[in-house]
Amino acid sequence: MTFTINNTNSTVFDSTNNENMTISEPVQPVSKGPKGITFSGETFIVPETHDMVKTLFDPTVKKSNFELIILSCLFSNLLVFLIPNNQIRIYIFIALYIFWRLSYNFGIGWLLQNQSNHNLLVSWSQKYHLFDPENKGALAQSIQNEIKSQRGENYDIKSMPVEFNTWLIFRKFVDLILMSDFITFCCVVYCSAIKDDYQFINNQSFWLVYSRIVLGSGLILFNLWVKVNAHNTIKDYAWYWGDFFFRQINNEELIFDGVFEMVPHPMYSVGYVGYYGFALIAKSYVVLAIAIFGHFLQMIFLHYIENPHIDKIYGPSKNEINLIKILKLKDLKNFDNLKPLVGLTNFNWMRASDIVNLVLSLTYGIIIPLFANSIKSLFILTVGMKLFESISINLSLTLQSYFKIVTKWSLSNDIPVEKSFSNWAVLYNSLINLTYSSLFGMNLGYFLQKSGSGSSSGGLLFSDWFYLRVFLGLLLIYTQFWINFSIIDSIGYFGWFYGDFFIPKSQSSIKNITTAGVYRYLNNPEQIFGVCGVMGIFLIYPTVENFVCVGLWVVNNFIRINFIEKSHMVKLYGEQEVNRDSGVTKTVKKHLLPEVIQRRMSNDEAYTRVNGTTHERRRRRSSNLHGNSVADSLDNFIRDLRNSSTKLSQQKLIELSQNLSFANSDYKLTIDGLKMQSTESDELKYTTIGTPVTVSWTSPTENHSVRDWIGLYKIVQTSYSRNKTILSSAGRWTWCKEPKGSFIFDKEKLFWEEGVYEFRYHLDGKHDVAYISEPFEIKSIELKVPEFKEDAIKFAENLKLEIFDKVIKLTDINEAISPIANQSDNVIEVYKLISSMISKSTKINITYKIFLNQGDDDLLSIKDVAIKLINIKHVLEELSYNITDKKDV
């Protein structure tokens, strides 16, 4: 329930489906109300609906048949309290809660997923005519009676779309599960609290009991505010997953308002803090455990059910997706086109700096603690390493910001600024790794020495609530990891490594700071959450040493963000751009501050904007990111045989393809335009990758069916089946509507890889084989890379003719590649295909990333590619031990 719709009379159209949607007149004339549209294009006025609390518990609202059943189910939980043994009651309510929670996440989840992908619920309604007044079946009548009991006797079921009526019934199913889930959880809380003579108020000091109750109640009230605010924002339509069934018109994108502007997915994140408030009040690890269990299942539900549907309905278009892919890959151009090491993530064994980082991390995190004599020495090492990292990084960033010392040194030594930035990223990450490895090593040493002495709690500032401390500590550590990855996802590796300090702004495609991702909610998410993992370690091991480390991490983080990064970002983007309110700030001002204070703050902000002295805020600039199968092995084996001294004859390949079995058949397939390897008759015919293949067919007129069809296959995948094709053609097929005809296989109808292939004629829309063509080979064209750049134009023309023209259409060798390639459904796959064809044709291996690291003004042309290949050849020849022995890279 995270669809953030602006109001009930608006929603979002899927840009991929709009062109196929036709809008008809409303089926029910209603004077007022939001307008809805089904996925088939039928429009209607959406009647008013009420939330589940009002419909179930408001005595002034008439109850429908299903609602009475739901209330009966809810009150039936009271029967469990007739059992005198409280422990048995706890077990029963836990079992009931697990049942309803699984029904929610996997029952409702399954229905919604299939409704989203296959329109399942609506199809059921149509299949069984559930809303047809003429259907007198028991199920249909009960469903229709339920609809009328909800909407009133005057409600015309047939005049409303089946999608809306199906949604009304689905809502009751949701009400039953959600309310039962919550009620059984509350029963677990109550039974756990009164266990052992009301243990939740016993065996603790007076102030601690009241602190728990007050804090827990605060969490519950905050949870209630989140739910109410969310419902007021998204209304019943999104609360009950309405856009799985139909859409509401006039809302073009997701709206971030209210609590949805405060945190991502509030219904699933902060929308469950009340569960932990109940656990705190009940003073029960059992309640805490089932709260974690329920919350975890909700996050799975969000990830696998809601997010895919949100992306499908509200997500970016194909062009936007292609752009995002390209920009994320462009972010790597400063790091040699490889994801840089962040911590130990993106580790690459072929990168020396990664191996050094791993060795140092293991040394400081494990080896040194194993041989250390005292915790004091480990503490000194950790503090020293943190001070060294803080001073060196902060000083380097300050000098670079004000004096550009790194850039000046790099340019004076003819080192590209991108390379100097890459070196800085390695240094920065290495120092960060050393500080966290030292911190981990200090705590490992503490654990080993205390375990060896037989005392596990000695030296701790407090030792109570161990399991709670571990849970909260691990939660804080996880939060830091999540925040860090969210930051990288929003601003890229460029922003993570302070790219604004090293790369000129004029060389970037983005001129403004990002307000996407986690930065939508917080201006500086790393201000606190960037070091909350250290706080988590302190909670788990609350020692003086860890407390000092927390102070060091927090102070350094505060100084770096507020006194170094902030001033640099203001210089780049200006104070007004940097100091805009975050989502959390806006929400607090709008919902939690009195109106008088809001007006006063608005006046102050207007004054400070005029005078250019807004409060401090900073954000890094975004870099505009928001085993081969057995058959393939056989194919490679055939190719290897062909290239070996023992040639595989055409006759043997024909036998392998079983073409001879159809020599006397009345059906015929002939392939036009194939070339001969040589004048020898036993050589296999071939064509080149991407070249269209024309196949002609002849079939007996009396036996011909318009559903006869031809498919293209690898012979190594079909050689075991002569009379029936079991393998899918994967779209490489065409109908044979006439007894005689021809068809050109090109583009997606072709295989774009080397191998030996055949065409198969199938009968009457089935997979029965009537004829198998002669085998033919698809292989790469051979292109020789010239020695000199003077020949680049002629070489580029060959590349255009033999490779590029088969994939994308360019007018000449000087036309930019990217604008044409970006028009495809998957630009990355296009680049991969072109780079693969070039590699096989020229025997110089390149990757698709060559098209992402483009030339001047980001307009890489075929001529530029030709020059790059010539340069690569020169480098390879110079590195070869024998200049006559050309290397295949």
Curated annotation (Swiss-Prot):
Q: Which residues lie on this side of the membrane: Lumenal?
A: 1-63, 113-173, 227-261, 306-354, 399-423, 492-527
Protein name in the entry:
Phosphatidylethanolamine N-methyltransferase
Gene for this chain = CHO2
Q: List this protein's GO terms for biological process.
A: methylation; phosphatidylcholine biosynthetic process
Describe which pathway this protein belongs to, using the record's wording: Phospholipid metabolism; phosphatidylcholine biosynthesis
Please tell me where this protein is predominantly located: endoplasmic reticulum
**Localization annotation:** Endoplasmic reticulum membrane
Membrane side Cytoplasmic: which residues? 85-91, 195-205, 283-284, 376-377, 445-470, 549-889
Give the enzyme's EC designation.
2.1.1.17
Question: Which molecular function terms from Gene Ontology are attached?
Answer: phosphatidylethanolamine N-methyltransferase activity
InterPro entries with a match to the protein in the record: Phopholipid_MeTrfase (IPR007318), Phosphatid-EA_MeTrfase_fun (IPR016219)
Record Gene3D superfamilies: 1.20.120.1630, 2.60.40.2840
Q: Does the keyword Transmembrane apply?
A: yes
Q: What does this protein do?
A: Catalyzes the first step of the methylation pathway of phosphatidylcholine biosynthesis, the SAM-dependent methylation of phosphatidylethanolamine (PE) to phosphatidylmonomethylethanolamine (PMME).
Name the keywords, alphabetized: Endoplasmic reticulum, Lipid biosynthesis, Lipid metabolism, Membrane, Methyltransferase, Phospholipid biosynthesis, Phospholipid metabolism, S-adenosyl-L-methionine, Transferase, Transmembrane, Transmembrane helix
Q: Which family does it belong to?
A: Belongs to the class VI-like SAM-binding methyltransferase superfamily. CHO2 family.
Origin species, per record, is: Candida albicans (strain WO-1) (Yeast)
HAMAP family, A to Z: PEMT
List the record's Gene Ontology CC terms alphabetically: endoplasmic reticulum membrane
